[in-house]
């Protein structure tokens, strides 16, 4: 068993400690023959006390770890979207800010000009097609997505023009820390960004 698998199994043990019904309410998720199901990173996710499955495939790597961590720490509270929070404004985030920008924001910058044409597809895939970004959100466009049921990310995109290069900023829903520790939030944003890039690559082929 790999290190990731050990951590995933430990997190799932904590997640299911109070029973599947209590966990289903916290996630929230549905109980079914495959386990507890809910959307995660644009795929159908199924949890059992033994494993995490994304899109029907057993996930034993970093994404599986993030999902298991969410399951282990999610609170019964409701998601509060506003005010959106920058990663740098989260407590104790200073040592991780460089890595966050490198992994969650900068990878989208070279393809910022493609985002408007792919926006609907991205929102549909990541559960952002039912809610708009908060009124007054800056940028040329924004993407409000839900990589996990109670964690929202808002990507603010500035398109390149004659004076300024493109830029992308990723913000979190107001109480995201209620449902995930800091390192898990950084990883959530990273893997959401990777999924957005995958969607754009799929759409261009």
Go through the PLM ranges and name each one.
Residues 119-134, 181-190:
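Short secondary-structure transition/capping segments
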Residues 88, 147, 152, 156-157, ...:
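Short flexible/disordered coil segments
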Residues 1-34, 64, 70-130:
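Short Lys/Arg-enriched alpha/beta "domain-start" segment
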Residues 43-67, 158-183:
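Intrinsically disordered, low-complexity regulatory segments enriched in Ser/Thr/Pro
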Residues 104, 108-109, 137-138, 177-181, ...:
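Domain-length accessory/inserted modules outside core catalytic folds
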Residues 59-83, 173-205:
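Ampiphathic alpha-helical segments that act as solvent-exposed interaction surfaces
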Residues 23-49, 132-159:
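Amphipathic, interaction-prone secondary-structure segments
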């Amino acid at each position: 068993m790999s290190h990731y698998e050990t951590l995933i199994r430990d997190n799932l043990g904590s997640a299911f400690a109070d029973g599947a019904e209590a966990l289903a309410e916290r996630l929230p998720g549905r109980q079914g023959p495959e386990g507890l199901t809910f959307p995660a990173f644009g795929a159908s996710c199924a949890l059992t006390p033994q494993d995490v499955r994304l899109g029907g495939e057993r996930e034993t790597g970093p994404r599986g770890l993030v999902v298991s961590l969410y399951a282990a720490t999610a609170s019964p509270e409701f998601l509060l979207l506003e005010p959106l929070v920058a990663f740098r404004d989260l407590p104790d985030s200073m040592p991780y800010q460089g890595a966050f920008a490198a992994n969650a924001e900068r990878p989208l910058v070279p393809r910022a000009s493609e985002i408007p044409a792919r926006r609907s597809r991205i929102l549909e895939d990541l559960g952002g097609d039912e809610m708009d970004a908060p009124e007054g959100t800056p940028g040329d466009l924004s993407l409000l997505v839900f990589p996990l049921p109670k964690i929202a990310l808002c990507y603010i995109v500035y398109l390149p023009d004659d004076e300024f290069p493109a830029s992308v900023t990723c913000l979190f829903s107001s109480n995201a820390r209620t449902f995930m520790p800091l390192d898990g939030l950084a990883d959530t944003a990273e893997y959401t960004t990777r999924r957005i890039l995958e969607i754009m690559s799929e759409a261009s082929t």
